[in-house]
């Protein structure tokens, strides 16, 4: 019988009826399978009783559940969550390359700082997320099938001549497609789950940081949003185009992280050979990953609806010539080492000129002309502008992955 044929709405009702009596989910499934074997096609009649005897043979419930959960999570991660995650990384990498030369005023502590490029800032996220992707792609998904306390006791009592360790290893590895865990109590220890959920939560938090950064870039005018025709930003302010996709992503990442953190903390502990806290906790795996997936969808929608606002970016750079204080005072230090006069206390001299003042290009050039720089250094410094003072930011994009 195909699973989809057996377990439709009527099957769910039958299973629920069994569980109402057993108060045990796996035992109810066992009885449900027995019911279905009674209805098997005529050609199976001669072996129905034998099949029913073998249902749940020598197994504890966790032998069934740990394999089912591991396969479900593995399938969800490999076929649903990770492709969506990769899509985010690929999009960021594409934009990092596209904007590698687009100068951008940095803000440290919310104040103007050494310029960077938009591409380099996006590449930072590509690199951070790529490290988490590698961990997720290398994640092991463990499983076990070894009886009530992990000793194969019932197996040997029934069939002592069978190499149950080899059977268990082959079944978990080749039939289930999981990594065999040879040493467990009644439960598979769930350490792989804690590792995975910790990594997904880490990735969530990096992307939450990205959402906040982009939100603030939009607020600052660095990114412009593409209005969606027919959409409403405010019920009373018709002009509004709100960054709701990033805000929704933030919220869903936060909910996902709270669930993932609970899963990772709870699942690594079990009283002696087992207690039931892990069973209840694992019922929230789908929600934890689902909220993250919803956040990924919102984030991708937001990223594809923004573009750099060149006018704002250029204006910010042109209004903050004081950021050239750093290269000037650093060049003064180098010249002081060469023995050039008037280069003492370089930091303090530049600070006196620039801190708390509006500085123009003329102010910078006059300051440079007033010092005893050699001609080459003076020319190099006077050629700098806030837009060109980006170091090797563009080249660093090549290291994003």
Name each region found by the language model:
Residues 61, 156-160, 175, 180-187, ...:
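A structural signal for small-residue-enriched, beta-sheet-centric alpha/beta enzyme cores
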Residues 40, 95, 99-102, 136-139, ...:
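Hydrophobic stripe of amphipathic alpha-helices that form coiled-coil interfaces
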Residues 76, 120, 194-202, 328-338:
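Short, well-ordered beta-strand elements within core beta-sheets of diverse protein domains
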Residues 1-155, 159, 163-173, 233-234, ...:
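A helix-coil-helix interface module used to build multimeric assemblies
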């Amino acid at each position: 019988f195909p699973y989809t044929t057996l377990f439709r709405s009527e099957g769910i009702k039958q299973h629920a009826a069994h569980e109402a009596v057993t108060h045990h989910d796996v035992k109810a499934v066992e009885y449900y399978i027995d019911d279905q074997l009674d209805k098997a096609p005529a050609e199976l009649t001669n072996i129905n009783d034998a099949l029913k005897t073998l249902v749940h043979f020598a197994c504890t419930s966790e032998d069934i559940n740990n394999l089912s959960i591991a396969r479900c999570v593995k399938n969800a991660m490999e076929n649903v969550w990770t492709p969506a995650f990769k899509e985010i990384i690929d999009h960021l990498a594409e934009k990092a390359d596209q904007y590698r030369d687009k100068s951008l005023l940095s803000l440290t502590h919310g104040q103007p700082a050494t310029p960077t490029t938009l591409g380099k800032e996006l590449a930072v996220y590509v690199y951070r997320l790529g490290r988490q992707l590698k961990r997720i792609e290398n994640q092991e998904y463990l499983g076990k099938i070894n009886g009530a306390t992990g000793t194969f006791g019932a197996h040997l009592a029934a069939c002592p001549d069978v190499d149950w360790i080899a059977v268990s290893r082959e079944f978990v590895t080749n039939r289930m497609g999981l990594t065999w865990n040879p040493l467990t109590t009644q439960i598979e220890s769930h350490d792989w789950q804690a590792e995975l959920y910790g990594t997904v939560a880490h990735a969530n938090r990096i992307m939450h940081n990205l959402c906040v950064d982009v939100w603030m870039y939009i607020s600052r005018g660095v990114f412009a949003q593409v209005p969606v025709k027919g959409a409403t930003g405010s019920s009373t302010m018709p002009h509004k185009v709100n960054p709701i996709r990033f805000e929704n992503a933030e919220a869903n990442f936060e909910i996902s992280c709270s669930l993932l953190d609970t899963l990772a903390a709870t699942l690594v502990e079990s009283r002696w050979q087992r207690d039931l806290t892990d069973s209840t906790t694992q019922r929230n795996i789908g929600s934890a990953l689902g909220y993250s997936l919803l956040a990924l969808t919102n984030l991708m929608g937001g990223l594809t609806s923004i573009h750099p606002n060149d006018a704002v970016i250029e204006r910010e750079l042109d209004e903050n010539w004081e950021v050239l204080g750093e290269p000037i005072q650093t060049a003064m230090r180098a010249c002081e080492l060469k023995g050039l006069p008037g280069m003492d206390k370089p930091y303090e001299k530049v600070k006196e000129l620039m801190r708390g003042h509006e500085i123009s290009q003329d102010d910078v050039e006059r300051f440079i002309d007033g010092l005893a720089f050699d001609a080459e250094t003076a020319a190099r410094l006077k050629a700098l502008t806030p837009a060109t003072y980006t170091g090797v930011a563009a080249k660093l994009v090549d290291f994003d992955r």
